[in-house]
Amino acid sequence: MDSKMIECKNVVYKYEDSNENKFIIAVDDVSFSIDKGEFVVILGRNGSGKSTMAKHMNALLVPTEGKVYVDKMDTLDEENTWNIRNKAGMVFQNPDNQIVATIVEEDVAFGPENLGVEPKEIRTRVENSLKRVKMFEYKKHAPHLLSGGQKQRVAIAGVLAMMPECIVFDEPTAMLDPSGRKEVINTIKELNDEYGITIVLITHYMEEAVEADRVIVMDTGKLVMEGNPREIFSNVKAMKRIGLDVPQVTELAYELKKEGININSDILTIDEMVNELCRLK
């Protein structure tokens, strides 16, 4: 059985800059694969190509050169587009752009209705999806009265109701306050842990990447680093060189080690830092 959900092979994506009459290379010869059930974070600065790469994962964009396969389906083949978008859902940065109805449960029902799902099955999917994101009690509410974090969870429920095997999140917390960010990240982690949904999270918040199985770092359209969170974030120099931060506790461990203190440099959480400092007593 093939366990790959997404496979990118030598992907190049160019677009024309009409002002300067030249082509811009947004993604430059990128190759990686994502297994079914995996939680992968793609990090990068603004303009690194990470969001462009995300849009290739459910055929919103297709490569200029190279190939992208979603569950073995070639995104360049237009006959696959419908099935690819059923297989890989997408949640965007601004939930207001993804919410289409005036009542929460009607919004969540919108996707399956357009798939031609039976009304009884739609009701079941809507209830289950809202329960998964802990928004069931708000099903009769108007989305515009909800907080940013709650709106984003409704948008996630709308994608879940279409029963995808993979969800690509394109900077879903960029417009949220810290509590809203925490709500959404906890929801994403739960979807992966409890329901086995493949997660691809595009972000520039380092703390959001700590829980991932794997981290991919992009810069100027290229894949520059790949590994588990400890491998990536303990390489503080390389991250700083490409203009990215690391979690604060990781940077603290790095600075302490530079000062000659015998401390592990691959610390990712506050609890790990506390344990390490207690060990040094």
UniProtKB/Swiss-Prot annotation:
Q: Which CDD domains match?
A: ABC_cobalt_CbiO_domain1
Q: Name one Pfam family in it.
A: ABC_tran
Do you know which SMART domains this protein is assigned to?
Answer: AAA
Any one GO CC term of this protein is: ATP-binding cassette (ABC) transporter complex
Name of the top EC class for this enzyme = translocase
Q: How does it sit in the membrane?
A: Peripheral membrane protein
Alphabetized UniProt keyword annotations: ATP-binding, Cell membrane, Membrane, Nucleotide-binding, Translocase, Transport
Quick check: keyword Translocase in the entry?
Answer: yes
User: Signal sequence span per UniProt?
Assistant: none
- Which PROSITE patterns has this protein been placed in? ABC_TRANSPORTER_1, ABC_TRANSPORTER_2, CBIO
Localization per Swiss-Prot or TrEMBL: Cell membrane
What function does this protein fulfil? ATP-binding (A) component of a common energy-coupling factor (ECF) ABC-transporter complex. Unlike classic ABC transporters this ECF transporter provides the energy necessary to transport a number of different substrates.
Query: PANTHER family given for it?
Result: ENERGY-COUPLING FACTOR TRANSPORTER ATP-BINDING PROTEIN ECFA1, HEAVY METAL TRANSPORTER
Q: Which family does it belong to?
A: Belongs to the ABC transporter superfamily. Energy-coupling factor EcfA family.
Which protein are we looking at? Energy-coupling factor transporter ATP-binding protein EcfA1
Which species?
A: Clostridium tetani (strain Massachusetts / E88)
